[in-house]
């Protein structure tokens, strides 16, 4: 029997990565929100989720093959499944990510895939104008991942508002999509947009990303919208339309967001729901 908790993931980044974006608490003279020191492993422990997508920052940290990177892997030993980023925040790449993923796949049995964050805009804000570069990059990534201990499927961040700008030839080279609604005010459009994504990408594996914090407004996601996206995600999961839910992120945890408190309780309440 498969339970919902088996398909819950944390979107992990280094502690303090988003501190400069956590500055909106009490606008208009109120106190500043302090940064988050919560690590990815701590975030997974706090939420009680067993799977991790570890994404490097736009400064490349944790840098592949460093002590920091290996220590993150050590902290993930209790987790069931871990994807590591081939492409980090803002589309950052060092170029040795695939070699590192192959290396850790031989050392840690839970390494299960490569993740491309912000990949579609890494060559510019209009991905439809950079199809050749995107194709060449993905082909290179996939070729290098062939040295891994087992097949490493490639998943990519897909923002709901930008799906129409991605060439089909590019989409066809990735195995899975993690769908995100960047501006929380657009969450009411999620059912319609997700159906369109299903029709456009019927063969891809799909996960739904869920934000606790809106980086465009510098505020916690509205509670009603938070409840909506969680419940809709569970509905998709029970229907077999997605294979997982991804919660973003440890870097906004431990600072008192009401959405984090809600999410912890919601995960505890739904963890034993049977899913396909």
Features from the language model and the residues they span:
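Glycan-processing catalytic domains of CAZymes
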Residues: 1-276
């Amino acid at each position: 029997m498969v339970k919902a908790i088996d398909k819950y993931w944390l979107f992990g980044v280094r502690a303090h990565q988003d501190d400069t974006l956590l500055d909106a608490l009490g606008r208009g003279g109120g106190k500043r929100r302090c940064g988050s020191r919560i690590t990815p492993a701590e975030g997974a422990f706090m939420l009680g989720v067993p799977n991790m997508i570890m994404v490097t920052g736009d400064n490349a940290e944790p840098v592949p093959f460093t002590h920091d990177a290996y220590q993150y892997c050590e902290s993930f030993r209790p987790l069931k499944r871990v994807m590591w980023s081939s492409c980090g925040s803002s589309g950052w790449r060092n170029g040795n990510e695939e070699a590192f993923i192959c290396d850790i796949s031989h050392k840690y049995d839970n390494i299960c895939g490569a993740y491309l964050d912000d990949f579609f805009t890494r060559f510019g804000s209009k991905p439809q104008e950079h199809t050749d570069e995107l194709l060449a990059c993905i082909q290179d990534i996939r070729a290098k991942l062939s040295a891994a201990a087992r097949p490493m499927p490639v998943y990519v961040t897909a923002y709901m508002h930008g799906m129409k700008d991605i060439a089909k030839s590019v989409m066809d080279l990735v195995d899975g999509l993690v769908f995100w609604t960047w501006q929380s005010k657009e969450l009411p459009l999620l059912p319609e947009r997700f159906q369109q994504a299903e029709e456009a990408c019927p063969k891809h594996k799909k996960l739904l990303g869920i934000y606790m914090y809106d980086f465009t407004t510098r505020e916690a996601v509205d509670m009603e919208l938070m409840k909506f996206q969680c419940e809709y995600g569970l509905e998709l999961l029970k229907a077999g339309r997605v294979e997982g839910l991804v919660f973003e992120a440890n870097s906004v945890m431990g600072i008192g967001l009401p959405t984090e408190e809600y999410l912890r309780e919601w995960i505890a309440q739904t963890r034993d729901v049977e899913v396909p």
